Amino acid sequence: GTFLFGLTALAAVALVVGYRSRLAALVLFVLLLSLHARNLLIANAGNWLLRRLLLWCAFLPIGRRWALDARHVAADRGRAVSIATLGVLVQVVVVYAVNAVLKLRGDRWVEGSAVQYIYQVDSLTVGLGDLVAGTPLLSVGSHAWLALLVCSPLLVLARGHVRTLLVAALAGGHLFMFATLRLGVFPLVSVASLLVFLPPPVWDRVE
């Protein structure tokens, strides 16, 4: 009940500020798993992806930078390479690649009418969704999104500007979904998952 929600919020805050980061990620994973199991009505792809990202975070050095935990560890600007880093990268790419395969099996995506059909469902549109519904650009959007999904393996195969541009394009697509469709946390979680693919020069500029 209320206690479980409070504990979940506390774990989320700890993760955001980077206090006992790995432990906070693991605790949050367990608590969200419990909450989602108790309420299947809120279950969606976003929650599924969020839980898996949290589980990977429990094995990643997420407290090494931009976290309270960073105060207690020696400064280290080296690369973090492990089975966990490989796992989280593969996890995200698999989501996109499987999505691409499923869409290629359907006629609507190949024809370019899938996105137009989605925006005709009033219960799904939100915000700017009603403004873009029915516009011819949605057909272009169908082909463009399918092309991005097909190219998703380049997230791990490509480097430098190519990878950065692909991350930006996929993130832009998700933000467009967030502004126009009622998809829960899926678009935002997807954007967060893409951040792990940004190359070091991007993060150096951020700092």
Please describe what each predicted stretch is.
Residues A74-A75, D107-V132:
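Membrane-interface interhelical connector segments
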Residues G1-R105, P136-E207:
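Extended, low-polarity transmembrane helix blocks
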